[in-house]
Structure formats: C-alpha cells, structure tokens
Amino acid sequence: MVRHGTPRTAFPTLFTERRNIMKNTIFTGAAIAIITPMNADGSINYDELGELIDDQIKKGTDGIVICGTTGEASTMTDDEHLDCIKFAVKQAAGRVPVIAGTGSNDTAYAVKLSQEAEAAGADALLLVTPYYNKTTQRGLIAHFTAIADAVNVPIILYNIPGRTGVNIDVATVKELAKHKNIAAIKEASGNISYAAKLIAECGDNIDVYSGNDDQIVPLMSLGAKGVISVLSHVIPAETHQMAQYCLDNNFAAAMKMQIEYLDLINDLFIEVNPIPVKEAMNMIGWNAGPCRLPLYEMSDEHKAKLRASLRKHGLVK
C-alpha cells in the first residue's frame, strides 16, 4: 500500500479560546471530510475506516468530519449514521476533534440527530442548509436556532448553495453568530467576494473554514481558520502543511503548494464528489470500495486522467 506524507511532531490544542467573545475555535488547520469505506456489497467497512482515521491523525490531520457529503451520509440508514459517529469518536479517542454531520432539510430530524451525535461524544456538529424544500433567510435563522438551542456542543454552519440551492446571506450568518453554540461556518460557495465579506463582517464572532480545496490559501489569507478537506485523503501531511503555512503567515510557501496541487484537486472533483476521491483511494492502495447508488462508478476516461494525476504527484506507480 502506498501511503504518503510524514507525521507532524506535535498537535496544537484542540480547542483554543477566541479573544473577542466567549466561544471556542473547534480546530485550526486542515480537517478531513472523510469518506465512508464500503465493502463490495455496499455495507460499511469499519476496519478500513478505523485504519484511515488513524493514518490521517498520524500524518497531521487536525480534525475528522464524519458523515458529511463526502461520507455519503445521505444514503445511510439512521442506525448507520449514528454508528459511524460513535465509531469515529471511539477511534479518534480525543486526539483530534470529531465533527459529525447532522444536517437535514427536516428541522425536527436534524434536532434529533444532533442530540444523538452529542450524546455519542461528537465534539462539534456540521449542519448543512436545508435543501429541496428551500426556505427563506428568516427560515434559516429559525432552523439553525432550533438546533443550536437543543444541544450543548459547537455548531458549524455549512454553506454549499451548489448542492442545496440556497445561499446563507452574510446578514443571516451575522445574526446566527450571536448564538453561543454557533461557532463556525464551512464556506463552500466558491465565491471569494462573499467569503471576504463574511470574514470582514462576522469574523470576530464566528470562525470561517474553506469548504473547497482549491481555495485553501485564498480564504485563509483573508482570515479563515482552516479547511474541511477532501484533498487530505491522498496527501494528508501536505494538506496540513499548506494550512499551517497560512496560520504561520507564510503565504508564499502556502501558495506554492496550492498551485502545485491544483491539477490534483481538480481531478479529485472531475465527477461528483465523492466518486473520484473514493476511486483515488482505491488506486493508492486503500479499500475505499464503491459508492452507494445513485452515485455511480467513474468513467474509464476519468479514471485514466485521475490515475495520471496521482502518478504525477508520486502517489501511484
């Protein structure tokens, strides 16, 4: 098995107090939006998930985001969803924070799942904006507030309008940031101007994380605290280092890495996430397995392009 990257020597404090308000920063650096390895029959491969969590932590990953988009939470049963969260908490064993995806377009269900994740030991929750039955900005405030009122762990809002069809307005984030449990936002709109305004107007009361690997350095140069990454699957140490350079204000070194890996990042999203990253993990020696339908096997043309990109960066022979 070819597994690249070198471990870092020490981990920063998992939770650091912000100066301006009494909230905690969940993590700084690079957290992984981790895949859910599957067996050939589509069942969850917990052995491989455990190995992957351990490998990521050893190589410097700063947090584990379980049951997110990349983890195929939308095709999990309720029992599988909660079991994965419990498993990740046990496997991480306090070495890095575990952030559980508990968002839904059903507020009552999101409250229930969030409470269960908290009881299971999740350090924080990731809550996507309601999708399909799209709501207004006032509805978003009511939705997220209902969940935040029901738990006692920090929440990361998840703005990804390309999937949900709704963008969280900066004014809405500013209002939500007044809640003691709403600590951060994963910004995955791809709109740098929006991100800049978000950080400028809300950054004193809420942390911002990049949700796009091709914008790690741009967003962190504006003041984002890190990234929730897919790239970290294949180059965990390097992804951590890129984010760490930003935290150390060494943006020249960080941008050099960002540019170096842009082709790999693009190819990891050549089809709908997480199809390419699971294929990449299989290629480099992990047993990531297939995706669950409706996500379908990658085309041969795209497989060849992805393999060439992995080869260029020394990840496969």
Protein language model annotation of sequence segments:
Residues 86-93, 115-118, 148-149, 177, ...:
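Surface-exposed amphipathic alpha-helices with a cationic face
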Residues 68, 129-130, 188-189, 212-213, ...:
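Short secondary-structure boundary segments
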Residues 102-105, 189-193, 211-214, 234, ...:
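Short beta->alpha linker loops
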Residues 214-317:
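Structured C-terminal cap/extension of enzyme domains
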Residues 24-32, 36-165:
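Active-site beta->alpha loop and helix N-cap motifs at the rims of alpha/beta catalytic domains
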Residues 3-21:
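Short, Lys/Arg-enriched N-terminal segments with co-localized hydrophobic residues
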